[in-house]
Regions:
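Short low-complexity stretches enriched in small and charged residues
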Residues: 4-8, 31-38, 212-224
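Membrane-embedded segments
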Residues: 28-118
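Residue-level detector of functional hotspots within protein domains
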Residues: 6, 12, 35, 64, ...
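Catalytic nucleophile-elbow at a beta strand-turn-alpha helix junction centered on a G-D-S/GDSL motif
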Residues: 17-33
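Membrane-anchoring hydrophobic segments
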Residues: 1-17, 22, 40-44, 72
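Short loop/turn segments at strand-loop or loop-helix junctions that form parts
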Residues: 24-25, 80-85, 223-227
């Protein structure tokens, strides 16, 4: 579950399995032979990817989600994939941000008691995305570079404990996608060479791309192109020229 603290911290602190967080967006939902989960399984790597990302989740959501698991991330390994659609003139969509936001992320962020430039900018962006937000007074202080007083810190600590308990209560009810392993990982294992080599994987990638991009000259997957673009491709000419 993208918003759950306990799911993420439990996985990343597992002593019996080494999970490496892979931060991103909808990329992780698109499986093929070169998906990180498939590669890790095929070549029995000493870790397994722990995918943290959903369609529409962008950098601010990921930043806040990281606040929930800073001890687990410290001195560790992580992979972060940037999506081109994040970089727009108007910035992130407020509705999309709120879909992946919860109060535990905010109390985790404020509990760090940071007033540096990064925290200040993050606080400003959060207020832009959700103007009427819990702990707005404390968040506004961080956004303005002001120190939090003892009363602020006590309130934040209280809210942090409350949010942690709420997360622990509801997280077990989050839907599990473990059943997708047989459906989304195993079928692709046979497409990979038994012996790992970048040259061989390049050949797999080229062969797969050629087989699935025959309907257009843009290198776009045939199913996506036919369903989403084919009928309106003419209208898109010059669409992003002035961005």
């Amino acid at each position: 579950n993208f918003k759950s603290r306990i799911n993420k911290t439990t996985a990343l602190s597992d002593k019996n399995h080494r999970f490496v967080p892979f931060f991103g967006s909808s990329e992780w939902l698109r499986f093929d032979a070169l998906h990180p989960a498939v590669l890790a399984e095929k070549y029995d790597r000493n870790y397994r990817p722990y995918f943290i990302g959903q369609r529409g989740a962008a950098s601010l959501n990921q930043y806040l989600g990281m606040q929930q698991m800073l001890p687990e991330l410290k001195n560790g390994t992580a992979v972060y994939v940037l999506s081109p659609q994040w970089f727009t003139k108007k910035g992130y969509n407020s509705a999309a941000f709120q879909q992946f936001y919860n109060n535990d992320q905010l109390s985790s962020f404020l509990s760090q008691n940071q007033t540096d430039a990064n925290s200040q900018y993050a606080a400003q962006r959060i207020l832009e995305m959700k103007p009427e937000i819990t702990m707005k007074s404390q968040l506004s202080k961080v956004a303005n570079g002001q120190d939090l007083n003892s009363l602020d810190k006590t309130y934040i600590q209280f809210m942090a404990e409350l949010n942690k308990r709420e997360d622990a209560l509801f997280s077990p009810f989050a839907a599990s996608n473990n059943a997708n392993y047989d459906k989304k990982v195993l079928p692709y294992l046979k497409e990979l060479p038994d012996k790992f080599s970048y040259e061989a994987l390049d050949q797999v990638a080229v062969r797969d791309a050629e087989a699935h991009t025959k309907s257009n000259d843009f290198g776009i997957d045939d199913r996506f192109y036919k369903k989403r673009l084919a009928k309106k491709i003419g209208k898109l000419k010059g669409f992003q020229k002035n961005l």
